[in-house]
């Protein structure tokens, strides 16, 4: 049996929120399709290709889509990355809570890409310590891809768009693109988020009265990478997020009836 995607759009707080849910079918699709990890993707704008290439972009740049991508009970048509330098950090972050990051303005901004709001979902899906079955993973992967690209009706273009977003942000941050071939898009988003967090952490560390577990882990990882793999830190061009200055309520002075004059008997 195969699982096919159903896309739904809800109106929440005045904005359109897309979700993808997979349902069991009664056989293989009757139209061209691909598998991105556990996700079946119907192909309407790209030709399926059985060739093996180094990068996802080697396919969609010529109007094609790899027949199989990523991990699964199949051979991927996109080659895996040569290394996963941030797997340890991803596993550590996978056990933290969102509030560990959102209390600091720069860390919050770092994990707000690519969704436009802070999320640890990509770390959860990429952690080797968090295990979910494919029934849950396929819904989450497809939903995250569509929400990241702000596309509400096309899963195929969402996966292409997400890899384009990863490549664009990687170039901005000074990340080697060979580490982000499009083999595992959820991991690759988490990889870019790690670099963003490491670049952002130095801003929040200088302002933190007492560093929490998230800042401590990021400080330790930063020190280790600077001594062993400094290129993994990227270009270090983070634009600081300045925390807002809290409003200070001033006591209003009572108005004087005598306008500053003192009566003398």
From Swiss-Prot:
The reported result of mutating residue 82 to A is: No effect on filament formation
Q: What is one GO cellular-component annotation here?
A: host cell cytoplasm
Q: What effect is documented for mutating residue 221 to A? A: No effect on filament formation
- Effect of substituting residue 88 to A: No effect on filament formation
Instruction: Recount the PTM note.
Output: Phosphorylated.
Subunit structure as annotated in this protein's UniProt entry: Multimerizes; forms 0.5-1 mm thick proteinaceous filaments in the nucleus. Interacts (via omegaXaV motif) with host FBXW11; this interaction is important for EIF2AK2/PKR degradation. Interacts (via omegaXaV motif) with host GTF2H1. Interacts with the host E3 ubiquitin ligase component FBXO3 (via ApaG domain); this interaction is important for GTF2H1 degradation.
Q: What is known of its domains?
A: The C-terminus disordered region is involved in multimerization, filament formation, but not nuclear localization. OmegaXaV motif is required for both nuclear filament formation and degradation of host GTF2H1. This motif also mediates FBXW11 binding.
Q: Where is this motif: OmegaXaV?
A: 261-265
Q: Which UniProt keywords apply?
A: Eukaryotic host gene expression shutoff by virus, Eukaryotic host transcription shutoff by virus, Host cytoplasm, Host gene expression shutoff by virus, Host nucleus, Host-virus interaction, Inhibition of eukaryotic host transcription initiation by virus, Inhibition of host innate immune response by virus, Inhibition of host interferon signaling pathway by virus, Inhibition of host PKR by virus, Interferon antiviral system evasion, Phosphoprotein, Viral immunoevasion
The molecule here is called: Non-structural protein S
Q: Which Pfam families match?
A: NSs (PF11073)
Impact noted for substituting residue 16 to A: No effect on filament formation
Renumbered to this chain, region (Disordered) spans 249-265
Chief location of this protein? host cell
Upper taxonomic lineage: Viruses, Riboviria, Orthornavirae, Negarnaviricota, Polyploviricotina
InterPro entries, alphabetically? NSs-like (IPR039434), RVFV_non-structural (IPR024376)
Q: Which family does it belong to?
A: Belongs to the phlebovirus NS-S protein family.
Q: Which GO terms describe its molecular function?
A: protein serine/threonine kinase inhibitor activity
Q: Does the keyword Phosphoprotein apply?
A: yes
Q: Which residues carry this modification: Phosphoserine?
A: 252, 256
Q: What is the effect of changing residue 157 to A?
A: No effect on filament formation
Protein's job: Plays a role in the escape of host innate immune response by promoting the degradation of host EIF2AK2/PKR and inhibiting host transcription. Cytoplasmic NSs interacts with host FBXW11 to degrade PKR whereas nuclear pool binds to host FBXO3 to target TFIIH subunit GTF2H1 for proteasomal degradation with the help of the linker protein SKP1. Removes FBXO3 isoform 1 from the nucleus. Forms nuclear amyloid-like filaments of about 12 nm in width that may sequester NSs binding partners, causing cell cycle arrest. Also aggragates in the cytosol as short fibrils late after host cell infection.
Q: Which compartments is it annotated to reside in?
A: Host nucleus; Host cytoplasm
The Gene Ontology biological process annotation of the record reads:
negative stranded viral RNA replication; symbiont-mediated perturbation of host cell-cell junction; symbiont-mediated perturbation of host cytoskeleton; symbiont-mediated suppression of host gene expression; symbiont-mediated suppression of host innate immune response; symbiont-mediated suppression of host PKR/eIFalpha signaling; symbiont-mediated suppression of host transcription; symbiont-mediated suppression of host transcription initiation from RNA polymerase II promoter
């Amino acid at each position: 049996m195969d699982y096919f995607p159903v896309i739904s759009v809800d109106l929440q707080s005045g904005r359109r929120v897309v979700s993808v849910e997979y349902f069991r079918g009664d056989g293989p699709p009757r139209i061209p399709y691909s598998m991105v990890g556990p996700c079946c993707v119907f192909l309407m704008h790209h030709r399926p290709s059985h060739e093996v290439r180094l990068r996802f972009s080697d396919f969609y740049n010529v109007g094609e889509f790899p027949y199989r991508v990523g991990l699964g009970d199949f051979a991927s048509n996109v080659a895996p990355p040569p290394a996963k330098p941030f797997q340890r950090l991803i596993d550590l972050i996978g056990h933290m809570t969102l509030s560990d990051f959102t209390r600091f303005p720069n860390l919050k901004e770092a994990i707000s890409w690519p969704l436009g709001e802070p999320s640890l979902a990509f770390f959860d899906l990429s952690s080797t310590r968090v295990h979910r079955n494919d029934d849950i993973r396929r819904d989450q992967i497809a939903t995250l891809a569509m929400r990241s690209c702000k596309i509400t009706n096309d899963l195929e273009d969402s996966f292409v768009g997400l890899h384009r977003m990863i490549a664009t942000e990687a170039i901005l941050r000074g990340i080697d693109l060979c580490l982000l071939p499009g083999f595992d898009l959820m991991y690759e988003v988490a990889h870019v988020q790690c670099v963003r967090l490491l670049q952002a952490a130095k801003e929040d560390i200088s302002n933190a009265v007492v560093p929490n577990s998230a800042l401590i882990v990021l400080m330790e990882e930063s020190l280790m990478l600077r001594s062993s793999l400094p290129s993994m830190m990227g270009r270090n061009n983070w634009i600081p997020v300045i925390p807002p200055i809290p409003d200070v309520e001033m006591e209003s002075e009572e108005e004087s009836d005598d306008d500053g004059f003192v009566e003398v008997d």
